[in-house]
Amino acid sequence: MLQFSTGNPRVLTNYVTLNFGKDTIMSILKKLAGETLSYGFSTILGRSLNFLLVFVHTWAFLPAELGVNVKLYGYVAIANIIYTYGMETAYFRFAKEAPEKYYQLIMTAIIVTSGFFTLFLFLFAEPIMVQLGYPGKGLFLNWLALILAIDAITAIPFAKLRLENKIKTFVKAKIVSILINVGLNLFFLMLLKPLQAGEIQIDAPQFLRDLYNPGIGAGYIFLANLIANASLFYWLSAEFKAYRWRWDWSEFKALWIYAYPIMFMSLAAMFNLMFDRLLLESYLPEGFYPGKSSQVALGIYGNCYKLSVFMSLAIQAFKYSAEPFFLGKKTTENSKENLALITHWFVIVCTFLWVGVSCNLFWIKTLFLRRAIYWEG
């Protein structure tokens, strides 16, 4: 039997007693840690490769050019929640009763709603971009709408893999998609861009020089993301072949009642994370940073913010294993005690990561932020 103090030195008798044996504790921690490391492998490798793109993007573009990416990806993070509207978590909750039925039902709902959302964004892409302050960039929103649709439609097959503990398939699909994204970024920005500008003197076919359109610029980051996401349909083909159209209003109503509070809570949490990037450009007083426009400030801030990837890696890996671990269980024996114990150690690990990153920023910035103009962020 283990006891944990609440941490208040003035109340020595306030303990949380965990009424299960040491072997049970160790088996829980071992299982969750093992799954976290398995999912963490793909997450850490993938995010690390994606993090290297900060090096590429800050080398290829000035802060003002990257401002549109920072802002639009902030909206994408919020739109992702709207596109899935809590159904990923609802799947973990209901699939333990009838896996195939709820997989097909939720997939049907996600496909239909993603189609409507994406059609809306396509129809109003240009007016929306004008309101955001980026006229003539409607193509960017078209690409992002497709990215959002693919993300939403593939979210449930990925959840199915996690619930069935098919870690290898999950990891393979994630890593290959990320490798394609990284490869295309390198191709567009470190080969085609300098080749078109005449910065690379090599004997290359003319069509390669014509592939890069300077008018698109940082939009190639969106295009690379779209192509990489589209590749997921191939790697998840088995899960899509298992899908059959299914609809039942009464069943969907039960799913929706469970899912919509999760959606609103997720929206609140995500807006809390993203509102700075969404509002900075509009509300930053002109001339607040001497010699820099608000768009330049947004580009600097948004790319420096990506240094937090070291923390987000651990959190995302933990989330991938924790959701099916807790929500996929049919019994709730000792669930409160298990959650308390796991949260206790999760906070400890995250604290050490935060301290480690904070103490090493002086060399991390020079390694990943290739232009000195970004360092002041």
Residue ranges of predicted features:
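N-terminal membrane topogenesis motif
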Residues: 1-51, 103-104, 249-265, 336, ...
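Interhelical loop/hinge segments that connect adjacent transmembrane helices in multipass membrane
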Residues: 19-32, 196-218, 224, 231-273, ...
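Signature of the first transmembrane helix
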Residues: 28-88, 113-125, 147, 182, ...
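Membrane-water interface segments that mark the loop-to-transmembrane alpha-helix transition
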Residues: 34-46, 72, 77, 81-126, ...
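Helix-terminus/linker motif at the lipid-water interface of multi-pass membrane proteins
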Residues: 51-65, 129-130, 267-310, 328, ...
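Specific pore-lining/lateral-gate transmembrane helices of multi-pass inner-membrane transport
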Residues: 94-109, 300-377
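Short membrane-interface helical motifs at transmembrane helix boundaries
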Residues: 116-135, 192-208, 352-372
